[in-house]
Curated annotation (Swiss-Prot):
This is NADH-quinone oxidoreductase subunit A. Pfam families: Oxidored_q4. NDH-1 shuttles electrons from NADH, via FMN and iron-sulfur (Fe-S) centers, to quinones in the respiratory chain. The immediate electron acceptor for the enzyme in this species is believed to be ubiquinone. Couples the redox reaction to proton translocation (for every two electrons transferred, four hydrogen ions are translocated across the cytoplasmic membrane), and thus conserves the redox energy in a proton gradient. Its main location: membrane.
Amino acid sequence: MADLIFPIAPGAALAIHVALSAGIVAAIIVVATIIREKRAGARPDVPYESGILPGTPPQGPQNAPYFLIAALFVIFDMEAAILFAWAVAARDAGWVGLIEAAIFIGVLLLALIYLWVDGALDWGGPRQRK
């Protein structure tokens, strides 16, 4: 079917894909170099990690809800990927697939409601959390 739309040799298609990809990467690097903030006295050889410069005193451990929210994001993001795969095959799955997806979404909603009621989604400090 692809031959009907784009009558091109597979090797040429690969070469075009590689050239376009390299061109996009080069364009992003050039634009980033042009529009980046230029600071006087900034040392380009010093690593910059999470907003903390090397040699500064430690700021203590990260707030625990940050990692909890990150873990919950990863979990629910994977569920979105599973639902996307179901949506692609929705016609072939029929009513049985629709019922299975509804049960799956229901379980996800119950888990989200449980986390919400439990306070896992509260970003506040220890005084505000249960």
